[in-house]
Amino acid sequence: MTIYRLSSSSPHSPMTEFSSLIARGWTTLTLVATVAITSPLDAAEPDSTTVFKQEVLPILKSHCVRCHGPDKQESRIRLDNLSTDLLQDRAAAENWNEVLHVLNAGEMPPDGEPQLSESQNKVLTNWISNAIRHAIEAGRSTDGRAVLRRLNRTEYQNTMSDLLGLEMDYARDLPPDPPSKDGFRNNGHALHMSALQLEYYLATARRALSRVIVSGPAPPVYQYQFSQGNVGNWLGGTERSSRLGRRQAFLAKMVDDYPEQGAFRIQVEFTADLKPAAGFPLLEVSVGYRPDTKILFREVQVVEITSAEKQTLEFYGRVENHPLPVRGQGKFPGLIVQIRNRYDDNSPLPKGKDNVFPDEPHLPTITIHSVEFEAPVCETWPPILHQRILFDSPLRDTDEVAYAQAVLERFMPRAYRRPVTTTEVMALVDFLQTIRPEFPTFEDAMRETLAMVLIRPDFLYLLEPAEEEKRQINAWELASRLSYFLWSTMPDAQLLAHAASGKLQQPDVLSQEVERLLSDPRSDQFVQQFTEQWLHLDVVDRVAINRDYYPQFNEHLKTDMRRESEQLFGEILRHNLSALHFLSSDFTMLNGRLARHYGIDDVYGNTFRRVTLPPERHRGGLLGHASILLSNSTGADSHVIRRAVWIRDRLLNDPPASPPPNVPSLEQANTDALQLSIREQLEAHRGTKSCARCHRDIDPWGIALEHFDAVGLWRDEIRHKSGKGFITRPVAATATLPNGQQLTGVDELKAYLVSERKSDFARALVSRILGYSVGRRIELSDREAIADLTNQFTADEFRLRNLVKNIVNSKAFQTK
């Protein structure tokens, strides 16, 4: 990093120029962010106000205020003084929308309370619908807008990698992205920027550019070859470490001379002893070192080996992305390439000395014949990545300023994802000229100048129109919105070419591009990011498994559990299947390890594939996924309320209200919990007046899943630890929903969701994907768009790929 020599008396010092340059960009950003978002129109028309006072309010007082009034506010909603100005009071608008929802669903008034007549229900629903529609129309020019959206960590990582072509952990120093209320990490309302964060972006840009843009002669190349004669292992010199079972490792050590930066190539020659009934071995290559008390390696790649023939594989990475030793320190100095067989069937290791290098002939092994290491790998000098930015030109040696301008004119449009103006380019050229005397070489000065590009709002934000009236986004904005939706990264050359020609906004071309993006492997980013955030899959890793209950649990299963749910989404998306498979399905996606966990036979290897499920497995759909069941458990047992809330929130977009303050948990409320079934505990909890109403609406959804334990295994008995042993009781999985529907077990719950709640699920999924696609929360102004998309979705038999295409072609996606 360059250390500037600053002087407060020097108005043209490099840091002064830097501050001036960045201030211009961030001031513009601030002005955009402060565009007025208020409207002089009132949300409630005079006639509407009269109707409310004369017809609506009396019904509320007679049927609703006892539970939603001054003395009691169930679900934290009070109706006797709820504002009727839905435009100016967003919270009131959302509460009225919730009232409309429960009225239409027949959930209110609840059983046991005086019911509304048909005419009374019509008065309420008509008034609320009209008030919401008027508020939407009055605020249409501003509602549903998120002018500024910063790239989140994933988007920044992918964008920097694609822009520079360099493998690096760009997001290493960035703070975590906070999820928005709807659970998404690409929501512009939650993605803020601090001064410290901007410093991290600058440091990251400098670090990356120092690796891409080089100067001076080519560095020396290090080449090593390792054979069976100089194999290392975990504990000392033994030839058995060349045959890799579950515990052995081939360690190729470079003690004295080794590179500390640059691209590397590792070539591994090996054979495999396959055991098809046990699954395939996994060849893992990692690079790092071994200090005295730690093992510090970072994985390069893992490959599933499906052939016993001798073969050679090559692996690539960058040295500086891996842990590096301090020269001359530690018991095991030097850089190490580690080769392992990561296969593990989760069976217990042999006892005693045999567990060091266990002889397990029934398991697959890998035999290493040789390992070659070379770094830095560079076919040309300067490297290709350097030449992509600082390209050959006669201007390079004749007119440095003109050459810099040409470089910026090529680099900035790719970074900003749009055409740039001469003014924008010349501002950076001026910056370069100002700082040039401070740097020994042109390359050094260009690194600093390009770093300024990479911390501009035009790069870090998805900037879209700030006009007071909504308008259709232009072709460049559409290209970015589409690529960040489906790839979580910048548009590629073809997408930008269609934007430049204007063809992208033609419906047939746009549809072709959506299909192309979905068929590209980069769409895995959409599958992974959306599925994780929609289903809250990240919670899986935060659940601590209670080893008293599950002593043999393999932590690698957590990754498999998450991948099952991601792979199911990917399978449904790729083949344009019905999204109702999320609710109930006759198949799932499994690898060998997760199949063994479920007790499903004849599934081998690490690769996930579609597996048909017999009905007695109860696994079909998300509610049979261990990811969902574990993330909504305690790590020792199921958690009925968490599972129920997850169903209501994630599948139906109907989250129950948060519990009132000072309400005890189940365990606190029931001191004799071990002697009670979960249903009995909940019934006792409902005996508390403050808890009864909410739990009547929540608990049944989770009780139906009680046949699944904490880690997603089927059970007929529930075990609880008592002293040094366990006590058991039969599973009770029968419950009655608020509408009187009785459910016994997960199969009846899934059938009910498909037959009676598929419309609610469809609307919920449309809302989630639309919100994710535009990077903002869904608001009342989106109500009409969601209704239209849901109708299309239903008419298309809930086909997921069609839904994505319809969203991209919708007015909501293409306007701002």
Language model features by range: what are they?
Residues 24-38:
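Bacterial N-terminal signal peptides
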Residues 44-98, 105, 112-118, 361, ...:
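Sequence context surrounding c-type heme c attachment/ligation sites in exported
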Residues 109-110, 133-137, 168-171, 182-183, ...:
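Secretory-pathway/luminal and periplasmic proteins that interact with or process carbohydrate-rich
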Residues 1-23:
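N-terminal secretory signal peptides that target proteins for export/translocation
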Residues 52, 56, 91-95, 100, ...:
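Secondary-structure capping and boundary motifs in well-ordered enzyme cores
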Residues 127, 155, 159, 163-164, ...:
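Extended surface/linker regions that mediate inter-domain or inter-protein docking
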Residues 408, 412, 424-428, 446, ...:
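Extended, hydrophobic alpha-helical segments in both membrane/secreted and soluble proteins
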Residues 41-223, 338-394, 408, 413-430, ...:
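Aromatic- and Gly/Pro-enriched helix-to-coil junctions and flexible linker segments
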